[in-house]
Design a protein with these regions (language model features):
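Short glycine-/small-residue-rich flexible loop motifs, especially phosphate/cofactor-binding loops
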Residues: 31, 76, 113
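A generic, residue-level signal for flexible/boundary positions that often mark functional hotspots
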Residues: 33-38, 42, 59, 87, ...
Length: 145
């Protein structure tokens, strides 16, 4: 008998890689943009994924949209407290119901686009949490090691 098809994980269910389907899709889009620009792909750092998820959840829970968290402080504070070392770092935030809407919004903003295409960044973590006024919160954390 033919093997049963493997069901696709729901967007909020982590796969074997530890990433949700939404998170993997966002990372794929980021790395496609980088490839088009002749840049190396970003490696996934699961510690950054954890922080990015915490940030997205915090924005929904506390009903804000800002790089400065009332709970955690700046993204750089979050990274330091987690013991993550870096030469350079950045954060992108988006509120959108789909990965394509979130990605398009970020790419159409010069500052966010600059983070995605920053040649000094080597690693990324993406955290997507469904809910809130936008349908989902998307946090991208970047570091250059």
């Amino acid at each position: 008998p033919a093997p049963a098809p493997t069901p696709n994980p729901a967007p909020s269910t982590p796969s074997a890689s530890g990433l949700t389907a939404d998170e993997q899709a966002m990372i794929n889009l980021v790395n496609q943009e980088r490839a088009k620009a002749g840049l190396k792909p970003l490696a996934v750092d699961m510690r950054l994924v954890t922080l990015a998820r915490q940030k997205s959840q915090d924005m929904i829970t506390n009903n804000y949209f800002s790089h400065q968290s009332p709970t955690y402080g700046s993204p750089f504070d979050m990274m330091r407290k987690a013991g993550i070392t870096y030469r350079t770092a950045g954060e992108n935030l988006a509120g959108a119901s789909t990965v394509q809407q979130a990605h398009s919004g970020l790419m159409n903003s010069s500052g966010h686009r600059a983070n995605i295409l920053n040649p000094n960044y080597t690693h990324i973590g993406v955290g997507v949490v469904r809910g809130g006024r936008y349908g989902a919160m998307w946090t991208q954390m970047f570091i250059g090691k």
